[in-house]
Design a protein with these regions (language model features):
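An aromatic/glycine/proline-enriched structural segment found at the starts
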Residues: 33-41, 203, 234-299, 457-491
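Sec/Tat signal peptide C-region and signal peptidase I cleavage site
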Residues: 28-32
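N-terminal secretory signal peptides that target proteins for export/translocation
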Residues: 1-9
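Intrinsic disorder
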Residues: 7, 25-27
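Acidic, serine/threonine-rich low-complexity disordered tracts
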Residues: 492-583, 626-707
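Bacterial N-terminal signal peptides
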Residues: 13-25
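M16 family metallopeptidases and their MPP-like homologs
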Residues: 65-67, 71-101, 110-158, 171-179, ...
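Mature N-terminal segment immediately following signal peptide/propeptide cleavage
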Residues: 42, 46-80
Length: 707
């Protein structure tokens, strides 16, 4: 976190206020008033007031828990099924998440819009989500709308229709979110870490582009029919309601609901490691390294949990824990380092994480390992133990203040089989943990000779130093094993033979979409102009708020750029770029509007590698590359708006059917990295090839071909 900067006026006023205070109350006078010099001792633990609840298992196997909580006129309902991601079939990871999203997207009686309008019209909410173990439908509203809540809950649980059109929208959103996730090193580290510690166990699997694409509507309906059954499900109702009232509503909403899900197959055991090693995920050019280390632990009811919770909180539970204080405050290596202990219905895990500067990756990892070792071999000092327990015990009441929080806590305890007294005795059990018990828990939970360590970063810069800590395996971001020879930065391949048949005269029109809504357009023309090819692109966004015309002159023989002229108008700003490419140099002037209202200008005279492409020509040149599934191209590109040269990598995936306003086409999916924002291009297979769609990773913008 950066320090808050105060203006000069604010600073002066602050100094004056301090001077006045010291004048009125000099230090000796303040001391004389008897202000304490040490914090007070903690008071005796007062019992948390957790409302009683009533529980019954209905004839259809549905477990119903009702908590009367009359302090606020609201009601919160959760309906949970054993249908989380761990139940996804192999090769169709993400199925449970798609089912959850589609549950509220239409029923026999209501469309998605009608469902949303009905619950939002009374100020409530209705949603569904999928975790690793459970799929949960949640609803919240004012308590005088509880009849409506159960009407909607029963409707989506029993009568969801899973429209095919909604499935495609959900799939598109999931793929966009996945692309963003894969662009983030912290997310990559988490995915690889789960795979390493769980192996073939379902907890170790993650959704992929291929698995999302493989899911059909039949898969969705079959999964829902098999797993969203009342037998073994849990319905928790908390709020300003009565037991008879809820029993009546449940009977009405779920009339005729029968059945139980089939037992799932026994999951494969997680691998048992005999030695610590490092999985290094190569992310070329990364300025930071993301470190995750840890191992699997125990089941949710293991009595060692409370002592392990104390030890893990001391290690890295917050800004006052050891990892944060040492790696950030003392060393200045990171903005934060943390540790956490996780429970699943099956085997849980613990982890420690840090994002550090590349040059201190090995030092930070060594310090992480050292601090883990200290918790295993040293008892926590009394003052630290008191502070840790004080935080965990004192903050617990904040998690059971509202009906929504109460419902969530009760559901979690019931689903994990933690016992009816878990919430009532949680604070007392934490308070009873001794320093020796915390040390014993750490010694058992943190396995020093079997830790999994995942580092995502620039392997070319850090691999050698990490080998001094533990054996290192290197993979790329797709998990493909790499050797030392693979770590050399990709060199531009120079000129690549382009397919001249793709240079046919044509005009393409595309829409620019923001979160699915058109906000502008782009029109591109390709035609002959004397002995050159002329590529002209015109773009307009926000009803004229942004206008740009780019003209690129190219050599028809090899597609090399000869000249670029660009005029950009952004509200009151106007910027022009005029460049010539010849003899391995680019010369001219470039200008680009900036967010602060200024225009950044460059005088350019730069020597470029052979075959360098102007970035404005990428949409024209890429369709003419010798495309094929599995092929990869590395091109040197010059970016006029930044006066910089970059190396872009174009990886061609498999063929996909892509539907855009212009029609449905077979297309190459091309992942482009190396630019400021990674993006994906979909290029038709028919000659002349056309760019059908462009998606920008982590951005809500999409460009789609219209005609």
């Amino acid at each position: 976190m950066k320090p808050v900067r105060r203006s000069g006026g604010q600073a002066v006023r602050g100094l004056l206020a301090g001077a006045v205070l010291l004048t009125a109350y000099p230090p000796n006078r303040l001391a004389a008033q008897g202000f304490p010099t040490t914090p007070p001792k903690p008071t005796r633990l007062s019992p948390a007031r957790f409302p009683p609840f009533q529980e019954v298992t209905l004839p259809n196997g549905l477990q119903l828990v009702i908590i009367e909580h009359h302090e606020q006129p609201v009601v919160s309902v959760t309906l949970s099924f054993r249908a989380g991601g761990s139940y996804d079939p192999a090769g169709k990871e993400g199925l449970s998440a798609l089912v959850a999203e589609l549950l509220t997207k239409g029923t026999v009686q209501r469309t998605a819009e009608q469902l949303a309008a009905t619950i939002e019209g009374v100020g409530g909410s209705l949603s569904a989500s999928s975790g690793d173990d459970f799929l949960t439908v949640s609803a919240d509203a004012l308590s005088d709308q509880v009849d409506l809540v159960f009407d909607l809950l029963g409707d989506v649980a029993l009568h969801a229709t899973f429209p095919a059109s909604e499935l495609e929208l959900a799939r598109a959103r999931a793929l966009s979110a996945l692309a963003l996730e894969l662009s983030r090193p912290a997310s990559l580290a988490g995915r690889f870490f789960a795979s390493e510690i769980y192996g073939r166990n379902p907890y170790g699997r993650s959704a992929t582009r291929e698995s999302y694409t493989a899911v059909t509507r039949d898969d969705v309906t079959a999964f829902a029919a098999q797993r969203l059954r009342p037998g073994g499900a849990l319905l928790v109702v908390a709020g300003d309601v009565t037991v008879p009232q809820i029993q009546s509503l449940v009977e009405k909403a779920f009339t005729g609901w029968r059945g139980a899900p089939p037992p799932g197959p026994a999951p494969p055991a997680a691998p048992v490691k005999r030695a610590t090693d490092i999985l290094l995920v190569h992310r070329p050019g990364s300025a930071q390294s993301n470190i995750v280390l840890g191992n699997t632990t125990a089941g949710p009811t293991d009595p060692m949990y409370y002592a392990g919770r104390i030890a893990t909180q001391a290690l890295g539970g917050g800004a006052d824990a050891r990892l944060f204080l040492i790696l950030r405050e003392q060393r200045g290596w990171t903005y934060g380092a943390y540790a956490s202990l996780h429970r699943y219905r099956g085997l849980g895990y613990w982890q420690a994480t840090a994002e550090v500067r590349t040059e201190v990756t090995d030092s930070a990892l060594s310090e992480l390992l050292r601090q883990v070792g200290r918790l295993r071999t040293e008892t926590i000092p009394d003052s630290e133990l008191t502070a840790v327990k004080g935080f965990l015990v004192g903050s617990f009441p904040l998690t059971i203040e509202t009906p929504s929080q109460i419902a969530s806590q009760v559901a979690n305890a019931k689903l994990l089989g933690l016992g009816d007294d878990y919430l009532r005795l949680y604070r007392e059990r934490l308070s009873a943990v001794t320093a020796l018990q915390a040390k014993a828990a750490a010694a058992r939970l943190y396995r020093p000779n079997g830790l999994t360590v995942v580092v995502v970063g620039d392997a070319a810069r850090i691999a050698a130093r990490l080998r001094a800590i533990a054996p290192v395996r290197i993979v790329d971001v797709d998990g493909k094993p790499l050797t030392a020879a693979d770590l050399a930065p990709p060199a531009p391949a120079g000129p690549i033979a382009l397919d001249a048949a793709q240079f046919a005269t044509r005009t393409d029109s595309s829409n620019v979409l923001l979160q699915g809504k058109a906000i502008g357009y782009t029109v591109s023309d390709v035609r002959r102009s004397g002995d050159s090819l002329l590529y002209v692109e015109r773009s307009s966004l926000g009803t004229g708020a942004f206008e740009q015309r780019t003209t690129v002159l190219l050599d028809p023989a090899d597609g090399s750029v000869r000249q670029v002229d660009q005029v950009t108008a952004q509200q009151s700003q106007r910027a022009e770029t005029h460049l010539t490419y010849a003899g391995g140099r680019v010369k001219g002037q470039s200008a680009a509007p900036q967010p602060d209202g200024s225009v950044k200008r460059y005088d350019i005279d730069t020597v470029l590698p052979v075959g360098t492409l102007d970035e404005n020509a990428v949409p024209f040149v890429v369709p003419a590359l010798p495309l094929g599934p599995g092929r990869s191209f590395t091109l040197s590109c010059f970016t006029p708006s930044e006066n910089s040269q970059k190396t872009l990598t174009f990886k061609v995936g498999g063929l996909e059917s892509v539907t855009v306003p212009a029609g449905t086409f077979q297309a190459y999916r091309i992942a482009v990295t190396g630019s400021r924002v990674p993006f994906t291009m979909y290029v038709s297979t028919e000659t002349p090839r056309r760019v059908l769609k462009t998606e920008f990773v982590g951005q809500p913008f999409v460009v789609e071909l219209v005609k």
